[in-house]
Amino acid sequence: MATFDFSEKLPFGEMFLVKSSEIEGRIDVGFYQHYQPNINSIKLSKLASMQGGKRLPKGRDYTDDETDFLYFRVSDMEEYGNTNFENCKFITAETYKELARYELFEDDLVISIAGTIGKIQRIKSIPQDKKIILTENCAKISIKDVNELNPEYLCLILKTEFVQQQIMASSIQTTIPKLGLDKVLALKIPVIPPLDVQDEIIHRYENALLARNNKLKQAQTLLNSINSYLLGELGITLPETDNSLNSRIFTVQMSEVGGGAFDPFTQFNKHYRIEGGKYPNERLDNIAFLQKGQSITSDDIVSGDYPVIAGGQTSPYSHNVCNHKGNVITVSASGAYSGYVWYHDYPIFASDCTVIFSKDENELITEFLAEVLKVKQQEIYLLQKGAGQPHVYPNDLAKLNIPLPDKPTQQKIIAHIQAIKAQAATLQAEAEQLLSQAKAEIEQMILGGAQ
């Protein structure tokens, strides 16, 4: 047989050999780029069956009423831990009857096959008396013999790089990426070890996940302490919220009504504002600039290094220019998350938001103002106006009262909060590193046992 001499300078993966006996149905190079012939494998179809989900019938929609019937979507899938059904949409009994053959059951595996490709979720702890219907953007995988294959072990296999690379190579890359059921069933799975070996690997993963979650919980506890610390430093005591019927029926003198807000919610919530304390308070517009963001559409975007800050809690895309250099606060202007407070110490392109920054850093440090506004987050959410598309307007933000200690006190508070955030960030990084290392070791155990 002829020999092949590949240049040592050729980057790994740009040229490789595949035996003709190893080619099955496809001859495109990309599909075999990550092929590992040394892994003893079998097709998924030998171990499990599949069924696609189903879209809501024409003329049917979700219901706002709580029912025993839920519709499971890609967005309801969790990367770690048990399935979270709390965000599932409700459907009516009539809709369920039409879709009953697409029901999910305990220990089914779900794989996303449209849009976001390759997410894997084991269905666990279905709420009592609830029926779950699967979206058309997913398919369910049902194990043929649970006495030979633990569902959790198969879930771990499907999340390995070995399988995920096959999934990406098998998908159709169109405007909306798609993955055919036949391609999923054709996935090559490392041979399955005895159940006791499966259980050992699962146990190791669960221990790593538990350790990760404990570190994340410690980090969140630290972050949650920031509000209490800041309020204590400012000498502000939060009033206890009373939502009893008697407290919700009240009278207001006309002299107390001002600013054009005559609705009962504004008058009720004003008693729960975070203001006062041991330092003087100033209206926000007296001590800070409030500027509207610059309108931009997806057609105007030129991919670049600067995150576009719009109406959500994350940046939807990046642009090639910025309109603020950093050290600014954004408050989302519209949408479900209108009022969301976000501090940026880096350049941004501010779009559907209000941009806030200090008029005088010697009097008010912008980063300190950001921490105060985060404490007032719920108060700011209550400024939302409009039903279909809620908005938070700059004129309403301008009226917020801001406690204003002297600059050294602001600096002390900022330093303490930064230390808390740094400690929390370290714990979060350790948590992800711990799990990442465990996943790599587990994948090696799974693949190593199949060689």
Where are the predicted features?
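Short coil/turn segments at secondary-structure boundaries
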Residues: 57-64, 86-87, 169-171, 241-245, ...
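Short, flexible loop/turn elements at secondary-structure junctions
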Residues: 76, 114-115, 145, 288, ...
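A short glycine-rich beta-alpha junction/loop motif
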Residues: 131-139, 152, 171-196, 347-354, ...
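Short, ligand-facing micro-motifs at secondary-structure edges
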Residues: 78-90, 109-112, 116-134, 152, ...
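Sequence-specific dsDNA recognition surfaces
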Residues: 41-60, 76-106, 282-330, 344, ...
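Non-catalytic DNA-recognition/assembly elements of restriction-modification systems
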Residues: 1-56, 191-312, 406-451
